[in-house]
């Protein structure tokens, strides 16, 4: 029964996204070689916000939904080794709205999650670090931190 709820909600999310989504963002369910759509895994792209050190980057993110969605949040992952204070070395994003014990609410949409992650890129939360490297540079060497962010943004150009 729960999987029916999850898939139904994700089908609605997909329909809503296709009608209206923020410029530069991509979010689509995984499609198999045979054309089947897997609503439980979405491949997304988050653009770096204009006017920030992240501008120009288009960052790939995968959202993994469980059968308990929307009671439980999706797991959101950048590529392994992604540089950011609130991204674990595995690529998993550490954000309050993705924490089922803290900020998650079933009403939160895919669009809200992706925009929240875009905001997090330029405004890290030093109170909730997930990787030592990004955290230390952000806190102790802002010039080097900005350099690393700009370099990473160049590593993820637009795919057009």
Swiss-Prot record:
Broad class of enzyme this protein falls into: transferase
Keyword Magnesium tagged: no
Pathway note: Protein modification; protein sumoylation
Enzyme Commission identifier(s): 2.3.2.-
Active-site residues per Swiss-Prot or TrEMBL entry: 94
Family: Belongs to the ubiquitin-conjugating enzyme family.
Protein name per the record: SUMO-conjugating enzyme SCE1
Originating species: Arabidopsis thaliana (Mouse-ear cress)
């Amino acid at each position: 029964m729960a999987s029916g709820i999850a898939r139904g909600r994700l089908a609605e999310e997909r329909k809503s996204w296709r009608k209206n989504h923020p410029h530069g963002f991509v979010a689509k369910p995984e499609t198999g070689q045979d054309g089947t759509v897997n609503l439980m895994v979405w491949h997304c792209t988050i653009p770096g916000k204009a006017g920030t050190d992240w501008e120009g980057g288009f960052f790939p993110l995968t959202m993994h939904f469980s059968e308990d969605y929307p009671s439980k949040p999706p797991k959101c992952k950048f590529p392994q080794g992604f540089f950011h204070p609130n991204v674990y070395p595995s690529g998993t994003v550490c954000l309050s709205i993705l924490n089922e014990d803290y900020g998650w609410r079933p009403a939160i949409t895919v669009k809200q999650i992706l925009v929240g992650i875009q905001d997090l890129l330029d405004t890290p939360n030093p109170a909730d670090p997930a990787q030592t490297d990004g955290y230390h540079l952000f806190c102790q060497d802002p010039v080097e931190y900005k350099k690393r962010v700009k370099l990473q943004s160049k590593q993820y150009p637009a795919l057009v």
